[in-house]
């Protein structure tokens, strides 16, 4: 069993339906993303990191508690971390793939997201 990632909500547009942006990932993918978030945020943005990881003991990683500014800063820092790697090892390449395939598409749909 892995972790459940709660990114946030789609913008409200009067359509009935689920606005939640969530995905469940296996343990390998969850651990890779957890390590990526640690690397990108723990040292310079501890408060944001703590909000994201608050529910980790329940196997949940959540961006829902972040303000619009915190959300966009976290995304920027994670993207910077990924793109600043000169030579990625296999694990880092896997982290990037999981971010780009599983998390980033949800992030881009979140009502707080700004490019």
Regions found by a protein language model. Give the residues of each.
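Acidic (Asp/Glu-rich) sequence patches and key acidic residues
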Residues: 1-115
